[in-house]
Design a protein with these regions (language model features):
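Charged, gly/pro-rich active-site loop segments
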Residues: 1-4, 78-141
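Extreme N-terminal tail/first-helix region
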Residues: 1-17
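Hydrophobic alpha-helical segments typical of transmembrane helices
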Residues: 5-9, 55, 97
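Alpha-helix boundary recognition
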Residues: 13-15, 60-61, 119
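Residue-level signal for well-ordered alpha-helical positions
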Residues: 58, 62, 139-140
């Protein structure tokens, strides 16, 4: 089975500013999906979200989630990560994660700005622990 420590999968997920599409189950059972900024860290997918958002409340209630990251031009590719999340409100971890996300998606010069803005009370660090990883890194082959 593929996993996030596979160098090719890790490189694909960590390249540039690709967003992930995170899926979860709403309270009424509907599947929901939204784009997120994310990091690959210690064999997990890490992102932040508001504790009182639909996503934050849903993941607190039901930790099952799936992430899909894709390449939308040739050679077309995707990685899907299925698993369960853990949530943290630790302020140091939150500030660190928010700063690292800011660096990846907005550039090093704006990392601290995004860390201050998003690493605040009421936000969560979400860590997706993979139970299954599916990857197709060259769909034209």
């Amino acid at each position: 089975m593929a996993d996030l420590t596979d160098p090719a999968i890790h490189a694909f997920l960590a390249e540039g500013t690709r967003t992930g599409k995170i899926g979860w189950t709403a309270k009424d059972g509907r599947p929901l999906v939204t784009p997120i900024w994310f990091l690959v860290e210690d064999g997990t997918i890490v992102f932040t979200t508001g504790k009182d958002t639909a996503k934050g409340r849903a993941l607190a209630r039901d930790p099952r989630a799936v992430l899909c990251v894709d390449l939308q031009e040739p050679p077309y590719a995707f990685v899907q990560v299925q698993g369960s999340v853990t949530l943290s409100e630790d302020p140091d971890q939150l500030r660190h994660t928010a700063t690292d996300l800011g660096a990846r998606y907005m550039g090093a010069d704006r990392a601290e700005e995004f860390g201050r803005r998003n690493g605040v009370p009421g936000e969560l660090v979400v860590r997706l622990h993979p139970s299954k990883v599916i990857a197709a890194l060259d769909m034209t082959a």
